[in-house]
């Protein structure tokens, strides 16, 4: 059912909590797991993100290594990908590239305001994704 599962990772608590769900899905369905981390690059004329560790390729590489180790310890093999760009767009592009059957994401809970909902990477992925998205609260 879920042959290819994409799990975008960052340094958030929500991503760590969603990892347990990913392990269960991958083990239950014998899925191929792809871990993705995105180095956020500002658009021309846009301010760079405020001192975010997600803008450093070195920090991203370390994050992916740590995530891969976490899954390996649970008996799950994972492929890692590092990309640059706007997270929501990159996540959807990679899902299309790898023919993902499911994207699993944590949810940060930016609030019920219209602005918070529209700015959420998760919301954008849900709206743009070429496959189902499982949001782990």
Residue ranges and their predicted role:
Residues 3-49:
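Small/aliphatic-rich secondary-structure junction motif
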Residues 24, 93-137:
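Gly/Ser-rich helix-loop-strand patches that form or flank binding pockets
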Residues 31-32, 76, 100, 131:
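Short glycine/serine/threonine/alanine-rich loop segments
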Residues 34, 79, 134:
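Conserved beta-strand positions in the Rossmann-like core of class I SAM-dependent methyltransferases
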Residues 42-43, 88, 112:
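Generic structural signal for helix capping and beta-alpha/helix-loop junctions
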Residues 48, 52-62:
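A short acidic, glycine-rich active-site loop
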Residues 69-103:
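Structural beta-alpha unit
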């Amino acid at each position: 059912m879920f042959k290819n599962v994409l799990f975008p990772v960052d340094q958030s608590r929500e991503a760590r909590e969603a990892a347990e769900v990913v392990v269960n899905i991958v083990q239950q369905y014998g899925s191929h797991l792809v871990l993705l981390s995105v180095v956020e690059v500002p658009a021309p004329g846009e301010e760079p993100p405020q001192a975010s560790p997600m803008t450093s390729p070195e920090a991203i590489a370390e994050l992916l290594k740590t995530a891969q180790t976490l899954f390996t310890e649970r008996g799950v093999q994972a492929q890692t990908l590092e990309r640059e760009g706007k997270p929501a767009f990159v996540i959807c592009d990679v899902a299309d590239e790898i023919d993902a059957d499911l994207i699993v994401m944590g949810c940060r809970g930016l609030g019920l305001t219209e602005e918070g909902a529209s700015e959420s990477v998760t919301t954008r992925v849900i709206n743009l994704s070429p496959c189902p998205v499982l949001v782990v609260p």
